[in-house]
């Protein structure tokens, strides 16, 4: 009854107006699973390959008809008739079929679309929510949202070198309450930026992109908005940064073009330590560049006991890179992006490895998103306790938050909220 009888790939648009892959998996019993694949702007060099057509006459070269062709052709032929509940087997067949170390032949976007659609079809066939199907009966932890309210770096056209300034409502008693905290700060920040004469248009992830000269200036606005919204910074709401520092690491130095400053590896680590000392910053993502291994070790030794240090470009959701990092003592947390690795099975393996080593994990969106809310279910399924899915604007972001509200309601009294315990720096 749960045999795969059809796989249908199609080209759809993401939140930036670029093509991406959507896949439907149809089962013998009539159940259907649908998944759409996200796409990043600041991508790690070690990520699985997103296959684009490269035909400049169509979508400026960003079409995905080759990946869709792989879904409808080779991948369907290899999986037709298989039991959809055999997720690990299905994912391994696709990995072997691709035959490259980084999924570059068929495309991680093709493989991931099928992988996630299979899990959704299986859940629908069993009449189970996806978080329950993937996570079993222990899946009940609602994640703390890391809400990206000020954007800089490659996500914005402003001088701020860091990519994201986030708020985390750790003092809330439930996910729904935490979301309200975030929304109230978001609207307060908007009016404060307006008062100061700043543009309040939103960026790719729904955050504001004001023309501010430095990280300090952005942090002052965030602190002010938290207080003016009636919350206490450091207890109700804490702050997170995504430096995306690979983007401004040049010739062994960190070049802050917006600030007009250049910092050495040691100076970069000390600068971040100074920010942590002056603001209630409890999590920093990609504080060092993806290949600056010495810098990562230095930063971890310096502030790893009091701050969550999240490896995104450093680990790219890859168990091999994560294992190396754990062994060397680099970072203490991993960002989980399903499209960095390209299958559900490998994604779950990365979360499991992190948790076994005492590292935290953060489920994450990409800057190019769709209305697909799979990562909301995966955050609950893995009990990871944290999710990063943008700001409180744009339906491609709120789709994930709204799904988490539904899950929390469905779990009822069983639901737990990550809160301060989700971040080891606060526990």
From Swiss-Prot:
Cofactor note: Binds a second Mg(2+) ion via substrate during catalysis.
EC number(s) from the headed UniProt entry: 4.2.1.11
Enzyme class: lyase
Annotated positions binding Mg(2+): 242, 285, 312
UniProt xrefs under CDD domains: enolase
Keyword Lyase attributed: yes
Disulphide bridges, residue numbers: none
Keywords attached to this entry: Cytoplasm, Glycolysis, Lyase, Magnesium, Metal-binding, Secreted
Annotated compartments: Cytoplasm; Secreted; Cell surface
Reactions mediated catalytically: (2R)-2-phosphoglycerate = phosphoenolpyruvate + H2O
Annotated (2R)-2-phosphoglycerate binding sites: 163, 337, 366-367, 388
Enzyme active site: 205, 337
Cofactor(s) annotated in UniProt: Mg(2+)
GO biological process: glycolytic process
GO cellular component terms listed in the entry, alphabetical order: cell surface; extracellular region; phosphopyruvate hydratase complex
A single GO molecular function term of this UniProt record: magnesium ion binding
InterPro entries documented for this protein: Enolase (IPR000941), Enolase-like_C_sf (IPR036849), Enolase-like_N (IPR029017), Enolase_C (IPR020810), Enolase_CS (IPR020809), Enolase_N (IPR020811)
Pathway annotation: Carbohydrate degradation; glycolysis; pyruvate from D-glyceraldehyde 3-phosphate: step 4/5
Family: Belongs to the enolase family.
Function: Catalyzes the reversible conversion of 2-phosphoglycerate (2-PG) into phosphoenolpyruvate (PEP). It is essential for the degradation of carbohydrates via glycolysis.
HAMAP family with a match to the protein in the record: Enolase (MF_00318)
Protein name per Swiss-Prot or TrEMBL: Enolase
């Amino acid at each position: 009854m749960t045999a795969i009888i059809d796989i249908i790939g199609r080209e759809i648009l993401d939140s930036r107006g670029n093509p991406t892959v959507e896949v439907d998996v149809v089962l013998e019993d009539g159940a259907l699973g649908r998944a759409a694949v996200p796409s990043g702007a600041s991508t790690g060099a070690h990520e699985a390959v997103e296959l684009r057509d490269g035909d400049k006459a169509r979508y400026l070269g960003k079409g995905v008809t080759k990946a869709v062709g792989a879904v409808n052709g080779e991948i369907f032929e290899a999986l037709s008739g298989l039991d959809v509940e055999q997720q690990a087997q299905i994912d391994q067949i696709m990995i072997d079929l691709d035959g490259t170390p980084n999924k570059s032949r068929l495309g991680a976007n093709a493989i991931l679309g099928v992988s996630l659609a299979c899990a959704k079809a299986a859940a629908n066939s069993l009449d189970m929510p996806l978080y329950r199907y993937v996570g079993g009966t222990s899946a009940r932890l609602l994640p703390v949202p890391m809400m990206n309210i000020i954007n800089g770096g490659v996500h914005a056209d402003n001088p701020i070198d860091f990519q994201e300034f986030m708020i985390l409502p750790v003092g809330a008693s439930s996910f729904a309450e935490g979301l309200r905290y975030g929304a109230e700060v978001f609207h307060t920040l908007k009016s404060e930026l307006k008062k100061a004469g700043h543009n309040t248009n939103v960026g790719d992830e729904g955050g504001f992109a004001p023309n501010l000269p430095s990280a300090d200036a952005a942090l002052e606005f965030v602190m002010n908005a938290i207080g003016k919204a009636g919350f206490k910074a450091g207890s109700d709401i804490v702050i997170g940064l995504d430096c995306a520092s690979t983007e401004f690491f040049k010739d062994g130095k960190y070049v802050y073009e917006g600030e007009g400053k250049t910092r050495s590896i040691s100076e970069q680590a000390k600068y971040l330590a100074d920010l942590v000392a002056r603001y209630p910053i409890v999590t920093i993502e990609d504080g060092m560049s993806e290949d600056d291994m010495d810098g990562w070790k230095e930063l971890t030794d310096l502030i790893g006991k009091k701050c969550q240090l999240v490896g995104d470009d450093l680990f790219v959701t890859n168990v091999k890179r994560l294992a190396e990092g754990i062994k060397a003592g680099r970072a203490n947390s991993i960002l989980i992006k399903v499209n960095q690795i390209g299958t559900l099975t490998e994604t779950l393996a990365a979360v499991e490895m992190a948790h076994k080593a005492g590292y935290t994990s953060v489920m994450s969106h990409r800057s190019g998103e769709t209305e697909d809310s799979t990562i909301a279910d995966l955050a609950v399924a893995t009990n990871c306790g944290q999710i990063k899915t943008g700001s409180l604007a744009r339906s491609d972001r709120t789709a994930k938050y709204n799904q988490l509200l539904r899950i929390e309601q469905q779990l009822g009294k069983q639901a737990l909220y990550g809160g301060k315990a989700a971040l080891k720096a606060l526990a």
